[in-house]
């Protein structure tokens, strides 16, 4: 058991009576990360566990059976975050976080980021500062709520990863989350516009089914 997991479990169990805890399981038709497919159009399973303290400190872990685009790719992703979030007023929130993404069978692909997020009314702005030469990422999204649904529009800009120009580009997505009987049904279209060459452009549709529980 690595040091982070020991620390996380210690914090999780020691502060549980003071915290809000939430776990989510999801089934996805593909894993899309910043406009790029991570699983070559194949389904993935994922689990997220999040803990929020009353003082605004927050932490969480996730695992996903993704990233097997080829036999040389890692076959699962495990990550964690530690941060702070603050509700300034009813219409303005911000959060700061340290995020670590790990691939147990391909540690060379591990990366860390610092993230800052502002949400105001139905808009959200996020900036991720890559550490150790990992590229930066920016994203703007808008959510429109109607009935038991969310219409979500997003735009993102991703710097190239090392010398891989195929990841250098912009991405757009439009989708709907529908909340039904405790489950969330998701459907969205994504488009990746590569700066290097139109041959690296990509688009597609993704479906998801998820269940979230607080405890």
Whereabouts are the PLM-identified features?
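Outer-membrane beta-barrel "beta-signal"
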Residues: 174, 178-183, 189-191, 200-215
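Short glycine/proline- and aromatic-enriched beta-strand/turn motifs that initiate or cap beta-hairpins
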Residues: 19-67
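Surface-exposed loop and membrane-interface regions of Gram-negative outer-membrane beta-barrel proteins
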Residues: 54-89, 94-108
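Detector for outer-membrane/organellar transmembrane beta-barrel domains
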Residues: 109-161
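Residues on the lipid-exposed face of transmembrane beta-strands in outer-membrane beta-barrel proteins
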Residues: 25-27, 47-53, 61, 80-84, ...
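Residues that define the transmembrane beta-barrel architecture of outer-membrane proteins
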Residues: 41-45, 74-78, 108-114, 119-121, ...
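Repeated loop/turn-to-beta-strand initiation elements of outer-membrane beta-barrel proteins
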Residues: 21-23, 55-61, 90-96, 121-126, ...
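Outer-membrane beta-barrel pore domains and translocons
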Residues: 26-32, 62-66, 85, 97-103, ...
């Amino acid at each position: 058991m690595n040091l982070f997991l020991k620390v996380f479990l210690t914090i999780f169990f020691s502060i549980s009576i003071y915290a809000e805890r939430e776990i989510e399981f999801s089934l996805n038709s593909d894993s899309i990360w910043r406009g790029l497919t991570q699983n070559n159009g194949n389904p993935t399973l994922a689990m997220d566990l999040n803990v929020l303290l009353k003082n605004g400190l927050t932490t969480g872990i996730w695992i996903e059976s993704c990233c097997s685009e080829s036999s040389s790719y890692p076959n699962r992703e495990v990550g964690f975050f530690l941060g702070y979030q603050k509700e300034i007023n009813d219409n303005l929130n911000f959060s700061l976080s340290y995020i670590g993404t790990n691939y147990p069978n391909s540690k060379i692909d591990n990366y860390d980021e610092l993230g800052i997020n502002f949400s105001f009314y139905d808009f959200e702005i996020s900036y991720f500062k890559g550490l150790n030469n990992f590229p930066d990422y920016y994203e703007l999204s808008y959510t429109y709520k109607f009935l038991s649904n969310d219409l979500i529009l997003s735009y993102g800009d991703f710097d190239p990863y090392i010398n891989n120009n195929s990841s250098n580009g912009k991405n757009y997505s439009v989708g709907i989350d529908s909340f039904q009987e405790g489950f969330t049904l998701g459907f969205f279209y994504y488009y990746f516009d590569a700066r290097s060459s139109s041959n690296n452009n990509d688009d597609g549709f993704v479906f998801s089914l998820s269940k979230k529980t607080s405890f």
